[in-house]
Amino acid sequence: MNYKKNSLIKTGAFALIDMLVKHKVKNIFGYPGGAILPIYDELYHWEKKKLIKHYLVRHEQSAAHAADAYARATNEVGVCLATSGPGATNLVTGIATAQMDSVPIIAITGQVSRAFIGTDAFQEVDIFGITLPIVKHSFVVRDPRDISTIVSEAFYISKHGRPGAVLIDVPKDVGLEEFNYHDYDSIRDHKPITKYRPIYGPSIRQIEKFKKMLLESKQPILYVGGGAVMSRAQHEIEELASFIKIPVTTTLMGKGSFNEYNPLYLGMLGMHGTAYANFAVSECDLLIALGARFDDRVTGKLDEFACNAQVIHVDIDPAEIGKNRIPQLAIISDIKIVLKELLSSMKEGTNNMDKNQTQAWLHRIHKWKKEYPLSIPHDSKLLYPQEVINEISQIAQKAFFATDVGQHQMWAAQFLKVEQGKWLSSSGLGTMGYGLPAAIGAKIANPNDLIICITGDASFQMNLQELGTIAQYELDIKIFIINNQWQGMVRQWQQAFYDQRYAHSNMAKGQPDFVQLANSYGIRGIRVTTSKDLKSKIERIISTPGPLLIDCIVATSENCYPMIAPGKSNSQMLGLTKQLKTITN
């Protein structure tokens, strides 16, 4: 539709795209369809003016995952689009993935016209109702005049407090309807009418108690989760840890929140965490939880998790406080704010500090590190997944890493050393198929950075169609497939807990030739089968311009250890036998 310059008569679709641009959205991910065509038609004009760019994925689930990773990589809100019916339902897994990991995304769905809602019209589903349990908030646009307010509220709600997913459902005729559009000259001057007002900041009394508990502790540990990453609190965490020499362990979501080359770093804790991190948590006298939620994959047997410790729990979401573990001190706040105030208070009273208060504790942890290091098996005739991932980590130290879910994800968490905001992985929901579209989102967010996708042969086949998106936009992404021809984690559990009854977990028969598959999309593919010259091969791969798929044929029966069996405590780990070749921090 043509508009006169300065005209106020606009369509709902115009208002929607205008508000996205006013909220500084530069890139969106989606897939068109009937009910959302008015929005796509409007988007066409805005793209011509280079005010916004849309990336066409090959499946709507990938649009949500790409928006999710874009949000993680930029600390902004990611946006995805899909049509009504199957387009909208295809977003559901991606929306749930983002919500479980507290990632701010806005999913915009088309809907049948208002007159047809409730009539079982073609491609009508109640996406508002379907997604209610897996979003932070939902909107249905019933009047185009509400679009400005709804979009502003969606951005506010998605980003403020504990971040999360927001759905905006837009009937087709709302996008087409013309009305007298009143935009906002400055979004900053527009205060959303929502009553959602999260409270930030600790009290002076809370900071003083935090300091007192910390200074009285002899065996403290920082237990850092995804909330610290979202808060971008790495500097403050490192300063606090260095100030009193406190060891630090992170969750899967918390990777990158602390310098992983720092000797105070213990790696990940929990089911596949390092032995020394789990031992340290089991023996600590003060557990400081920063943006972590005490989930089952971390705690093991909850009654025995840090059972001798006092707990300080800092989280922006009051619902997480006391949900699984009652703390002695609870602070509902952004982590960065709390740590800044704590550090300021501690620096004022340095004369009362015992500089050696944790020396014996650190010495004990150092012994655990030497006794139970992460192991890397080696055989010149074979290729082990730990070798591949460890070499990638050493060569690509500044890269963004997107992973899928399974054994390779746990090995990546163990061996990759990542920087703040550069770890992209589905942690809460554990969504297979996340890695490839996440790598796309990260590349769009950071076009000049190295993006590496580490996936498994089973996970990769969940969303391999996104090779088409990578080819279309010529995205320089390096895809390492850890190919053991199994659903590796399922096989490991079947071996350990189901008497080796491998029910439907073998993927060998019917597996495509991934190299030829990549070539069919116009993407170069290569295969690596042994550890011979592995370092030089990976160096060449990473330095080669353009997208590249690497099919790593690894030992088929390798298991991921350490491992905590269901119902066991974190001090009861499987697989702590010494290996021929080891690596320590």
Swiss-Prot record:
Record Gene3D superfamilies: 3.40.50.970, TPP-binding domain
Keywords recorded for this protein, A-Z: Amino-acid biosynthesis, Branched-chain amino acid biosynthesis, Chloroplast, FAD, Flavoprotein, Magnesium, Metal-binding, Plastid, Thiamine pyrophosphate, Transferase
Pathway(s) it belongs to: Amino-acid biosynthesis; L-isoleucine biosynthesis; L-isoleucine from 2-oxobutanoate: step 1/4; Amino-acid biosynthesis; L-valine biosynthesis; L-valine from pyruvate: step 1/4
Gene Ontology BP annotations: isoleucine biosynthetic process; L-valine biosynthetic process
The EC number(s) this enzyme carries: 2.2.1.6
SUPFAM superfamilies in the record: DHS-like NAD/FAD-binding domain, Thiamin diphosphate-binding fold (THDP-binding)
A single Gene Ontology CC term: acetolactate synthase complex
Signal sequence residues: none
Enzyme type, top EC level: transferase
Domain of life: Eukaryota
CDD domains, alphabetized: TPP_AHAS (cd02015), TPP_PYR_POX_like (cd07035)
Annotated positions binding FAD: 162, 272-293, 315-334
Tagged with keyword Chloroplast: yes
Localization in the cell: Plastid, Chloroplast
Cofactor(s) needed for function: Mg(2+); thiamine diphosphate
Main location: plastid
Residue segments, region Thiamine pyrophosphate binding: 407-486
Subunit comment: Dimer of large and small chains.
Entry's family note: Belongs to the TPP enzyme family.
Protein name in the entry: Acetolactate synthase large subunit
Organism: Cyanidium caldarium
Classification lineage: Eukaryota, Rhodophyta, Bangiophyceae, Cyanidiales, Cyanidiaceae
